Amino acid sequence: MSGCNCGSSCNCGDSCKCNKRSSGLSYSEVETKETVILGVGPAKIQFEGAEMSFASKEGGCKCGDNCTCDPCNCK
């Protein structure tokens, strides 16, 4: 069971922990490249691919405002 109720009353189930860390959440981070160009002028630093995401065990049910699913796409 996904813990998410889809339909007209789309909301997350009991396992929803909006804005809180819980054991039901996993953290993933994408590798980041940093390019530093040095020379006569000031240093320029550029970051590429600085992305972070949180994934839950609720089968695609992401918590939005007021602990509702955003978007409601439960599997």
Curated annotation (Swiss-Prot):
It comes from the Eukaryota. InterPro entries: Metalthion_15p. GO terms for molecular function: metal ion binding. Keywords: Metal-binding, Metal-thiolate cluster. Belongs to the metallothionein superfamily. Type 15 family. Metallothioneins have a high content of cysteine residues that bind various heavy metals. This is Metallothionein-like protein 1B. It comes from Vicia faba. The gene is MT1B.
